């Protein structure tokens, strides 16, 4: 696992996404997992460089 540094705005957006999922009946733990996985995928794709 690795750390992802998020801006305050990105953190707020993640919280909103978690709250939206919870409003749809998803548990808080599962909502956090879903959003965290999405953030890791985005971060992983951002780290790729043409040299790889």
Curated annotation (Swiss-Prot):
Source taxon at top rank: Bacteria
Pfam families per UniProt: UPF0181 (PF03701)
InterPro entries found in the cross-reference section: UPF0181
Disulfide bonds: none
Family classification: Belongs to the UPF0181 family.
Protein name per its UniProtKB record: UPF0181 protein NTHI1697
